[in-house]
Amino acid sequence: MTIQMKGNRPKVTVVTVVRNAPAALKVTAESVLSQTYADIEYVIVDGASTDGTSDYARSLGDRVDVLISERDNGIYDAMNKGVRAASGEWVIFMNAGDTFYAPDTVEQVFGTDDYAGFGVVYGDVAKKNASGESVVKKAGAPHNSHRMFFCHQSAFYRRDELLATPFDTAHRMSADIHQVKRLWKKGVRFRQLDLPVAIFDTGGVSNVKRSAGLRDNISVVCELDGLVDRLRLLPKLYVPYLMCLLRGK
């Protein structure tokens, strides 16, 4: 597939993964389709929904560039499918329920040359509080960590990096940090931006049961890090993991 650019502005592919969540998909699609950036491709990957989700996706017509509706092996398998279907130079995952922070978010990121020379460009994420207000959570500086230092909803990845380093679907809860650590270790450059990119749906997969997510993070560190980094990182995971087990979370 040929990577496309319009003038000096890169084409950006937004991938939305969904299954049996028509209301959440509607919220996300409206956010994506309202972006002011001129060259956006929209890819929806529906995991063979059994309700009205695929009907709604089809109702969007040619505003959706690629619609895949078939069974998958979980969210990260579906996200890999979205990357393979994309034709943009950059890819961002805005899954069902997530939205861009503002209509001009993509324009803010790619309206300058701040992304040049980097493989991952990321910003902050906002979460809704009990009153429904968006509270911005700052991303961390790039480093080899025991957990994500940004939310993947707030990150733009070069598509060629995602193709070379896809999500490992063996990690059903923590394939995102597994991927980020592999990118970091192969020397991919990360660029942190001082702006909110996404509003995060806190009902996502890694928020369902925290102990399961922490256990998978532990396995990622054990798999990818050497002894020194294990000694540094594992205590930061085992303490909250044991606390979650005691609390039944």
Feature map (PLM): residue ranges:
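Short, Lys/Arg-enriched, disordered terminal segments
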Residues: 1-10, 239-249
